[in-house]
Amino acid sequence: MAAGARAQDPPANLARRIAHQESQNQAAREEYNYRQTVEFAELNDRGGITGEYREERDVILSPQHERTEHMIGKPLSTLKHIVLTDQDFADMRGIQPFVMTEDQLWNYETTFRGDENIDGVDCWVLQVRPRQILEGQRLFDGMIWADKRDLSVVRVAGRAVPQILSTKSENLFPRFTTVRQKVDGRHSFPVYTFADDTLPFRSGLQRVRVTIRYSQYKRFGAESVIQFEKP
């Protein structure tokens, strides 16, 4: 009887090294314009779509390095049971393309969870949980997968926290997965976010499906647009 292969030990200070790489990726992404496409669907208990929301917007960097968002056409909505809130859209910008930069690392406890091959890439796996959540703060609770070669994050999966509940209202958030790909073979940017979850509202369970695509990355001042393969 042969013993199984022992999991490889992670490098020292893995979380801090990943956060350093994340800081570089985030700084690079702030030099790029891109398009964000959102599709949000309500589903019934048979999986049929009962209502949808769709929008496209360009995220643009100005010569003064200020970021603006320009809606392409008008959003289309046939949602019947759910109202998308300002917090939902803020999470699309800040949590679902989650970046664990060095200045964010202190907010989180990280636990090494081994290694895993993701789409042919050997990765270290970290569990990431908030140390505490202050009033009004939005954080990430989930897992990240980082390429063993350069510690670039290739996938995150989890949820924006906390759920927002009061006696009169509730704002619930689905579990999601965000996939990243390399830009110019260097920096790892989000290209696709997907969620398919059932939210336990007081009025009843509601299944939702969310797809966010980040495309047409173009470095400010460059003429070419970077295209990715569809996940």
Give each language-model segment a name:
Residues 7-140, 148-154, 159-174, 182-192, ...:
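Structured extracytoplasmic
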